[in-house]
Amino acid sequence: KKKLPVVIAVSIANGTGDAQGSERGLEYDTMSGKYAEFVEREVLPRAAAEAHVKFTKDPNGRATMGYSSGGACALIMAWHHPELYRRVLAYSGTFINQQWPYNPQAPHGAWEFHEHLIARSPRKPIRIWLQVGDQDLLNPNVMRDGMHDWVLANENMAKVLAAKNYHYQFVFARNAVHVDRPTVR
């Protein structure tokens, strides 16, 4: 009989603002391992000390999870540090071009995952759960770069993950908007 092990969630408030040029965009949408390193170096030791808990070091027992840009951040953390995290839950994941400041290694931000990174990289030992609503965000007028359609981005993610033989699940929710409350329940 399999049982779910004890789960400890550590939630981190993001910086202010949204999109490119915001503190939140810098924290969550930056295509690097810096945020995972910050969590590992500063957040988890403090949480463990204050809550008197011990976190597993087994990456198969650790997950990252987020909504919107937090969903992109969850995959960014696992992608850059699969030795730390191997489970990703991305709800209305912002796999679009939200990164700020510009990064020449990933010029299209999280859009790079389905555009280039996953297809061109060796398969990583991570499992991914994705969800998007059919009425999720599309911001064609904010940035006219063709990389701000949440539905298309998540559909593209599912396609490239399947082509690369990843362990993943893609949930396409009908009549659902961005981070749709009824879908969460």
List each language-model region with its residue ranges.
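Non-catalytic cap/lid and distal C-terminal segments of serine-dependent acyl enzymes
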Residues: 1-185
